[in-house]
């Protein structure tokens, strides 16, 4: 019935789903940092010539990022659309015994539009260390990254006589470790590199305290990994 439908909409608006959505999006976005670092290492090894990563002979490099993502809604939650753009820069050099070591930093911005007019923006500041070791055709790559987030959320709550515009500003962080092993198979007409990779990602915010109306939410620190 219409009453049941209105009740479902009210519960959805009260839930503060935008905070879970932005956390999910930032965890998913963590892959862009490690993909860039692994891509740079493959480039330095001579296994890839990525046009997205611009590098000089001294080991300095930069990559512009632009990505779009979405999550579909269902009977229990609304979906969202998100975009992330920014730049990563780094510097690496060859070391003794076929090692390569480097550091990287960068800035990205994530904008997310959720259900019922909710919106979240996050300014993301990245710092990472990475490296690889080659054993003939076998390459081992890995690194660690840390990202600081400054999150700004806005959401509307409208049902019955209730009409709120609730906002929040809070910080969060993402930590990640990643490793990859690849084996280069080079032939006269074909070059292949079968590989396997692993990643551990931990996200934690510093608590949420919305301001606005009676529907404003407060929450303690939350983390996911």
Which functions belong to the PLM regions below?
Residues 175, 186, 195, 199-202, ...:
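Outer membrane beta-barrel transmembrane domains
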Residues 2-192:
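Outer membrane beta-barrel translocator domains of Type V secretion systems
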